[in-house]
Amino acid sequence: MEKKFSGKIWKFGNDIDTDTIIPGKRGTIPDRNEMKKYAFELLKPEFGSTVQPGDILVAGTNFGCGSSREQAATVLSYNGVRCIIAKSFARIFFRNAFNSGILLLTCDQIQDVCEGGDIVTVDVDAQTVSVNGKTFKVGAVPENLYNIVANGGLIEDTKKRLAAGNVKMDIKPLSMEQCRKKGYTMVEKILKKNAGKEHVAPGDIVITKPDMFMIHDIYTTYLLETMKDIGADKIDDPDKVTIVWDHCMPTAVAKNDYDHYEAGLELAKTYGIKKLHIGEGICHTIMHEAKYAKPGEIATATDSHTTTYGGAGNFCSGIGTAEMAAALITGELWFKVPEAIKIVLNGHLRDGVMSKDVILRILGDIKADGGQYKSLEFTGPAAHEMSMEQRFTVANMALEAGAKCGLFEADEKTAEYYGMPLEDIDWVCVDDRSKV
């Protein structure tokens, strides 16, 4: 991939969500070359028929917000979009786009001096974008992400890794004593423990070995297709994986989405996955009821509301199917350490006031992108009075502020719920000496 290139601009505003990029009714089209024709069909109907390979999108804040729908990044990649320049990106779209081979750059000035049809020049090494005689600085691209784009996306990158012998990093988790070291936010503690790093800071890229992976039935067909494309005949640790049939059940079996049902069974048989839950309930509820997502650990799933498990102090975040496939094969997953917002819930919940009311008020205060790529960390008397189900409810909706995760402190209720000694998890707490 060239480090300097030019392309025609397609200009968009703020809060362009994944439903705008590809409407939900088009998201199940099995042929990506057919699906790509419907990109932006409700906003820019001409896009699908006139976009050219190498074109560049320029947008405002929170581009790619809403659902974790990986198809949004996929259709842009299949349409040949080379780069997206925006003021900010929704966190899951950010990952999905890089994994689809699209270069993302952050810049908050170019939007005011360009229009659709203008030609913009990108210089990766100089960290600049230029249009209409003006040049602006852009954020640096982490080396690991640039390499994914240069290799043609995560699938091709993973193929090359397998061909080279799938060499894994030697990651040794931190001891309990090291986890208790002062001066870190909850998310920093969990990430540094898993990554075996004695120190992490916001913006750092860390390689982790997640403790649990969850796949639900909407994405079983795409995941199976991706695994076959990569050529994987085994996964790193089948015992760390669960498949939940819930989004399409029971109609999937009855009439309309039988392929998703069968694909899940084929995934389980092919890769030795034993933790199967067919029509037993909502995937995010099963994750904590089955004790798959534990305090102080890392869980990830093919769904945006994976943040739910943060109610137990579990670092959890949604990813796309390409990234899930790569992570299942390698056992590894990168994360950018987020900044944190400490939210102190003082007082007590009055009769008739539910945890849903609390998070809705918080969302109203900080708005849809107020937690963009941040860890919302809850503490205070009202937080500790909440039941585990109430905490899961709050954490579930942290996503709606663009948050990377929503974490509650692990306390006596958490220990009782999981049947764990409190002293094993009490380090998952807000540290007043942390930079939050």
Q: Where are the model-predicted features located?
A:
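Fe-S-dependent hydro-lyases/dehydratases of central metabolism
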Residues: 1-436
